[in-house]
Each structure stands twice: as C-alpha cells, then as structure tokens.
From Swiss-Prot:
The lineage of its organism: Eukaryota, Metazoa, Chordata, Craniata, Vertebrata. Homotrimer; three monomers form a donut-shaped structure with an unusually asymmetric charge distribution on the surface. Interacts with CDK13, HRK, VTN, NFYB, ADRA1B, FOXC1, DDX21, DDX50, NCL, SRSF1 and SRSF9. Interacts with CD93; the association may represent a cell surface C1q receptor. Interacts with KRT1; the association represents a cell surface kininogen receptor. Interacts with CD209; the interaction is indicative for a C1q:C1QBP:CD209 signaling complex. Interacts with FBL and RRP1; the respective interactions with C1QBP are competitive. Probably associates with the mitoribosome. (Microbial infection) Interacts with Rubella virus capsid protein; the interaction occurs in mitochondria. Its main location: mitochondrion. Belongs to the MAM33 family. GO terms for molecular function: adrenergic receptor binding; complement component C1q complex binding; enzyme inhibitor activity; hyaluronic acid binding; kininogen binding; mitochondrial ribosome binding; mRNA binding; transcription corepressor activity. The keyword Acetylation applies. It is found in: Mitochondrion matrix; Nucleus; Cell membrane; Secreted. The keyword Heme does not apply. This is Complement component 1 Q subcomponent-binding protein, mitochondrial. The modification Phosphoserine is found at S201, S205. Residues 137-163 are annotated as: Disordered.
Length: 282
C-alpha cells in the first residue's frame, strides 16, 4: 500500500485550485509553485481560554520541557509520534524505490541538476539542444472511488503508481546564429500518458513556440508566441518532426518520465528525512 502521507495530501491539494490567487505565469516555463492550502485544524485548538485547564504539552512544555530533558525547547508527545511515523514512512518509501541512482537518458544527453530543476543537453551537427523541466507539481492528482475493491482483493493492488509527467521546454540554438533560440513548450496530455494502443500516437504535445534571446535568463512575454491550439496541422507535424530529428521523440519522452519520476521520488524521500530531522531537532 502506498504510504498515507504520500498520496492523501496530494489528493487534497488538487481539490482547492479555486482558492488559489490567479497570478501571471511565463508562457514557456510551466514550473509552478504550490498554492496556499487550507488549515485542516480549527484555530480554536491553538488558543487556551483564560481560566481553562491547560492541555499538557499542547503548545508549551511544563517546566523546561514536556519530557523533562531540560533542553528548554518545545517537543511534545505529538512530536515523538510524528517522528516515529516519519521513520516508518521513509522505510516504506525506500522499500518501493525503483532507482537508487538516477537512470540515464539514451542519445548522449548530459544531465545537470539544480534542486528540483533538471536540464538535459546535447549537441547535434552544430546545434545545441537543451531540455529543461521541473519536478515540482509534476505528479497528476489521483482520485479515489472510481472502482470499489472486490471482496478479498487487496487495496494496494488498485492504488495507481505515482508517475511524474512534468512540462518541459526545448531550446534549440544554431551555432551560426547563437543569439537566437527556438523555444518549444511541451507537455504530456493526461489522456496520452501510459497509452500503448496506438503505436504512432505522440505521447507529448507542443503547446507554444517562439524565438527568444539565448543570452537572456528570462524569456520575454513581448516576443511573439505561437499557440498550437489554432495551428495548421501540417505546420504542427513539421514542428514535431523537427524535434524528433534532434532526439526529442516518444522514446525520449518515455525516458524523461522515468528520469523525472526517479528524481521526484528521491527528492520526496530527502524531504521526509529533512522533516524528521527538523521535528526532532533540539
């Protein structure tokens, strides 16, 4: 069974997008940040009325601390239970971890990591191709209740495997014109990921195309951006062939999902370890 901490908050997080404030986003870098989340506990629990009996160890330790170790810091029985839970969670996540090291991409791609952002780079016949993606918010939400488990059937067999399908940006720079980059913003349509019925079907799509200055760290919204929703299909097919000729095809997209999923799981385990260290720190 997938650990409770990993699946439940992500499901709850997907249920409150309407509460998030709308903010302008770059048309290419779909590297989203998490929105605000609702507090699951009433604020009344965080205060104590005058004259009421104080719950030991809820907010303040009695004396130097609740456990009597004399450190003078707040750490309650709830913190201890939290740390024990995180220990079990980390063990379970390591048990189901498929890749102890990140899988390599075929085709001579070089990987460069910067936290949750990853860059894949290669050079082909005088051209530099860079693919950038971010694992944050890259796991599609899962919803319960689609199918009830039959009698005697284990629940964990019906829980879907978490797969990271990040948006990614392809940047192509030609050496004879190194100041200009062709930028293609791509994503994985939800109805295409994991489908193997149609061998010729593309598992990723191009959403937007533009030219940007290769020396700029941030791309400009003032540059003309071509949205593929209203694009002639012949032109769209040529753009997809353009990417395939440079190694960005279905095979690449499959391997990118595998790499991103392994990286996301690795970062998730690191987050749990940091959270455990923070809660138990004195």
């Amino acid at each position: 069974m997938l650990p409770l901490l990993r699946c439940v908050p992500r499901v709850l997080g997907s249920a409150v997008p309407s509460l998030r404030a709308a903010a302008p986003a770059s048309p290419f870098r779909q590297l989203l940040t998490p929105g605000p989340r609702l507090c699951a506990r009433p604020f009344g629990l965080l205060s104590v009325r005058a004259g009421s009996e104080r719950r030991p160890g809820l907010l303040r330790p009695r004396g130097p601390c609740a456990c009597g170790c004399g450190c003078g810091l707040l750490h309650t029985e709830g913190d201890k239970a939290f740390v024990d839970f995180l220990n079990d969670e980390i063990k379970e996540e390591r048990k189901i971890q498929k890749h102890k090291t990140l899988p390599k991409m075929s085709g001579g791609w070089e990987l460069e990591l910067n936290g949750t952002e990853a860059k894949l780079m290669r050079k082909v016949a005088g051209e530099k191709i860079t693919v950038t993606f971010n694992i944050n918010n890259s796991i599609p939400p899962t919803f319960d209740g689609e199918e009830e488990p039959t009698q005697g059937q284990k629940v964990e067999e019906q829980e879907p495997e978490l797969t990271s399908t990040p948006n990614f940006v392809v940047e192509v720079i030609k050496n004879d014109d190194g100041k200009k980059a062709l930028v293609l913003d791509c994503h994985y349509p939800e109805d295409e990921v994991g489908q193997e019925d149609e061998a010729e079907s593309d598992i990723f799509s191009i959403r937007e195309v533009s030219f940007q200055s290769s020396g700029e760290s941030e791309w400009k919204d003032t540059n003309y951006t071509l949205n593929t929703d209203s694009l002639d299909w012949a032109l769209y097919d040529h753009l997809m062939d353009f990417l395939a000729d440079r190694g960005v095809d279905n095979t690449f997209a499959d391997e990118l999902v595998e790499l991103s999923t392994a990286l996301e799981h690795q970062e998730y385990i690191s987050f749990l370890e940091d959270l455990k260290s923070f809660v138990k720190s004195q």
